[in-house]
Amino acid sequence: RICDDSSIPFLRTPQLCPKGQDVCYKKTPIVKKFKWLQKKGCASSCPKNGFIKIFKIECCTKDNCI
């Protein structure tokens, strides 16, 4: 799998994911002024919010899908 791992919203930096990490994800803070703190990368499963939902989380299973 190839996923983007850039933390900058408009920049794409594709990376080859380690074996077993077949999900691409993007975590974006819900508060708009903190959107630049987004995190993208590879995972073995889609990350989840904790007790309080502070991130919008998107996941997919195709190369460069987010």
Swiss-Prot record:
Keywords: Disulfide bond, Secreted
Main subcellular location of this protein, as a coarse class: secreted
InterPro entries: Snake_3FTx, Snake_toxin-like_sf, Toxin_cobra-type
Function: Not toxic to mice when injected intravenously or intraperitoneally.
Name of protein: Clarkitoxin-1
An example molecular function term from Gene Ontology annotations: toxin activity
UniProt key word Secreted: yes
Localization annotation: Secreted
Gene3D superfamilies found in the cross-reference section: CD59 (2.10.60.10)
Tissues in which the UniProt entry reports expression: Expressed by the venom gland.
Disulfide topology: 3-24, 17-42, 46-59, 60-65
Keyword Secreted: yes
One GO cellular component term: extracellular region
Annotated family: Belongs to the three-finger toxin family. Short-chain subfamily.
